[in-house]
C-alpha cells in the first residue's frame, strides 16, 4: 500500500510531501518514523543536492531557509538519522498526526488506510531566554 506523508507547519501549511510503501496496514510509530527517514535519506543520497530537506538535521549541517546545508556534498548515514529522529520524537522535537489524531509513543500501533492523512509537524525551538 502506498501512503502519503506530509511535513506541515503548526498552522497546517504543507512544506513537503512524498509517498512511502507499506507492506502492512498496521505499523508502529517507530516503524513509521524509520520508513519515512530511510526514504528521504535514500532520495537525498541518490541525487546529493545542495540542501537536505529532511525531518532532522544531519551531522555537520547548517540550518538555512532552504533546508539543511551540509559543509560538503556527502552521503548521509540513514541508520544514524533514524536514531536521531527517534530520539527527537521522544524529546518532542516533532509530533505525528494520523487522521488528525496525535501519536504519542514509539510502540503505539497504528492502523492505516490508503486514504489516511499522515502529518509530521516539526516544532521549532524558541530562541532567547
Annotate each language-model stretch with its function:
Residues 1-129:
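Ubiquitin-like/PB1-type beta-grasp interaction modules and other compact soluble beta-rich domains
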Amino acid at each position: 500500500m502506498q501512503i502519503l506523508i506530509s511535513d506541515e507547519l503548526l498552522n497546517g501549511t504543507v512544506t513537503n510531501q512524498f509517498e512511502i510503501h507499506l507492506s502492512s496496514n498496521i505499523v508502529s510509530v517507530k516503524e513509521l518514523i524509520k520508513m519515512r527517514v530511510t526514504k528521504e535519506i535514500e532520495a537525498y543520497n541518490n541525487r546529493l543536492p545542495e540542501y537536505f530537506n529532511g525531518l532532522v538535521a544531519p551531522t555537520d549541517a547548517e540550518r538555512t531557509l532552504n533546508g539543511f546545508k551540509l559543509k560538503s556534498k556527502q552521503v548521509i548515514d540513514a541508520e544514524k538519522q533514524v536514531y536521531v529522529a527517534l530520539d527527537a520524537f521522544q524529546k518532542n522535537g516533532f509530533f505525528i498526526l494520523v487522521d488528525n489524531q496525535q501519536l504519542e509513543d514509539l510502540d503505539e500501533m497504528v492502523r492505516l488506510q490508503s486514504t489516511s492523512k499522515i502529518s509530521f509537524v516539526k516544532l521549532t525551538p524558541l530562541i532567547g531566554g
